[in-house]
Amino acid sequence: MATYNGSRYVAQQLTSILDQLDEDDEVVVVDDASSDDTRDIVAACGDHRVQLHRLPVNRGYAAAFEAALERASGEHVVLSDQDDLWPQERLVAMQRALGTASVVVGNVAVLGTDAPLRGPFGQREWRLPEDPSHRVRILAGLALSNVPYFGSAMAFRSDFLPVLLPYPASARELPDAWIAINGLVRGTIAHLEQDVVLHRLHGANATGTIRSPRAVLRGRLLFVQMLREALRRRGSGRGSS
């Protein structure tokens, strides 16, 4: 988990995570130089499984998450935002899927309604394709920002970390897509039908924000760069997945 000025909701999120963990599991939290009391709240939870790391200066969301991945030591790496909630049985379902896949992604529901997210092109229900084997089609949808691959709904095996790290420059704006692209090009990604995140909508994270044409164009350029790098890493035999 990467945190930044998340004092309002981070304690609730930590509780929803810790309730599903075993005693020898860990929660790696990297705080990106918050200016509020987020770090104090995390430290005050008093659970030995929570490992808090403080960045001395604000480096941005992707860099903080990369720092958290570098510190992860468990067999399975399960990602989390600071202000959502984990529904019950999330961890069990994702660990089961990781028995045969390197990366697993689930769906996202809106907290308080259990309704699915609305899509960027007017879809009333924005959900993952049931079959992730249609990789070219899914990659094309991802290039158009029309596949709901959220990092907070992802998990992967620890042997996938060498595939992802270090992040290329192109992934520092779209780290969620970077994970998905690598899972797709290697054919090792699984989709869960169930909701694995209860997403909290508030002013600081409003889903569905309209992007400018320039931002859309830049996103597609970054996608191409990430895809090329993922293919290069696969060709070089990087990682064991």
Regions found by a protein language model. Give the residues of each.
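Nucleotide-sugar donor-binding/catalytic module of glycosyltransferases
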Residues: 1-211
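C-terminal, non-catalytic tails of nucleotide-sugar-dependent glycosyltransferases
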Residues: 215-241
